[in-house]
Amino acid sequence: MISDLISKLQEKTDLTYDEMNQVMTDVLSGKTTDSENADFLSNLTDKGETDDELLGMLDKMQEFSLKIEPKNTGTIIDMCGTGGDKLQTFNISTTASFVVAAAGGVVAKHGNRSSSGISGSADIFEYFGYDLNLEPPKIAEILEKHNICFMFAQKFHPAMKHVSVARKQLGKRTAFNLLGPLSNPAKVKNQLVGVFSIEYLDRLPLILKRKGAQNIMTVRSDDGMDEFSTSSTNRVCVLRDDKVLMNAIDPEVVGLHKSSLTDIQIQTKEDAIESFVGVLNNTANQAMIETTALNAAGGLIVANISNNFEEAVELALNTIKDGKAFSLLEKFVQDTGDISKLKEIADG
């Protein structure tokens, strides 16, 4: 089956939803070889994925994944980027997730170790002693108690191990980079997603709309980040009430200072940890704090807590300045990890 579809892709012929869904059953069951998988993914990337193809893959990924059943009432969101911007910035969406949760949102964070950056969200949670292999019911409890949790992609998507060799061999972006952030195990209907390419800005909301999404915001900054940036204008696409709207967000217009990309870049895993804690306890540089606030603002709008960016940025900054964000981190680490690790960084 897969060899026929590889031939089709080589001829630049699009696959149907059903063809993709069927071949993904074989791929994620381990019935195909590493070289077939690499060939398939490479040719798919070269052809360019259609929405039907992406949806066929996404539905099958979710069918094969573990799930969590959140007990929280109200809007549950996720916020993350597709990664791969190679800009070596600090962990913006992870930091912003704690700000959103401290400001009254509920964030079911889904993430992984870093693929092309210095530190991924999993690296941060793990550093503070969070068990990446927690079972779904325990994670649902953590979410209910703290309004934030972390679901490790490798734990929740065990079938993805069948494509890990092929993805490493290829060493380039494939459809899975795009679909990872969309395959949240808590089945969230409200998401902020940073994208690595402008072409996906309006495509992802439309794909997620077909899956019953409610509020989706995608972002790409003009300086190349798959997150909101305070060093340039940000292109934003919003799905709300079944309508898709494009917008541009200028950081200075929403009350922030223009910064430079170098202000938020890091070089080591230690830098990543220190930046994460530094923002939440309000000791990091202005650019890191304001970049986090702008990304948290996107999350607060998606979570139906704020109506516009000006209001949301102010709420995010106040949540950091009045100590609520750091207080949540302390309680979270006390409950799920090793508080001495946090004290060491915070007091350092």
Swiss-Prot record:
List of residues binding 5-phospho-alpha-D-ribose 1-diphosphate: 81, 84-85, 89, 91-94, 109-117, 121
Q: Subunit info?
A: Homodimer.
Q: Which GO terms describe its cellular component?
A: cytosol
From the Swiss-Prot or TrEMBL record, give the protein name. Answer: Anthranilate phosphoribosyltransferase
Record keywords: Amino-acid biosynthesis, Aromatic amino acid biosynthesis, Glycosyltransferase, Magnesium, Metal-binding, Transferase, Tryptophan biosynthesis
- Asked if the keyword Glycosyltransferase belongs to this entry, the reply reads yes
Necessary cofactors = Mg(2+)
Q: Which family does it belong to?
A: Belongs to the anthranilate phosphoribosyltransferase family.
Listed binding positions for Mg(2+) 2 are D226, E227
Q: EC number(s) on record?
A: 2.4.2.18
What does this protein do, in the record's words? Catalyzes the transfer of the phosphoribosyl group of 5-phosphorylribose-1-pyrophosphate (PRPP) to anthranilate to yield N-(5'-phosphoribosyl)-anthranilate (PRA).
Could you tell me which species this protein originates from?
Nitrosopumilus maritimus (strain SCM1)
Q: What's the catalysed reaction?
A: N-(5-phospho-beta-D-ribosyl)anthranilate + diphosphate = 5-phospho-alpha-D-ribose 1-diphosphate + anthranilate
An example of a Gene Ontology BP annotation on this entry? L-tryptophan biosynthetic process
What are the binding positions for anthranilate 1 in this chain? Answer: G81, N112
Q: Pfam families given for it?
A: Glycos_trans_3N, Glycos_transf_3
Free-text comment on the cofactor? Binds 2 magnesium ions per monomer.
Q: Enumerate the residues binding Mg(2+) 1.
A: S93, E227
The metabolic or biological pathway listed in the UniProt record of this protein is: Amino-acid biosynthesis; L-tryptophan biosynthesis; L-tryptophan from chorismate: step 2/5
* Record-listed anthranilate 2 binding positions: R167
**InterPro entries with a match to the protein in the record:** Anthranilate_Pribosyl_Tfrase, Glycosyl_Trfase_fam3, Glycosyl_Trfase_fam3_N_dom, Glycosyl_Trfase_fam3_N_dom_sf, Nuc_phospho_transferase
Q: What class of enzyme is it?
A: transferase
Instruction: Drop me one GO molecular function for this one.
Output: anthranilate phosphoribosyltransferase activity
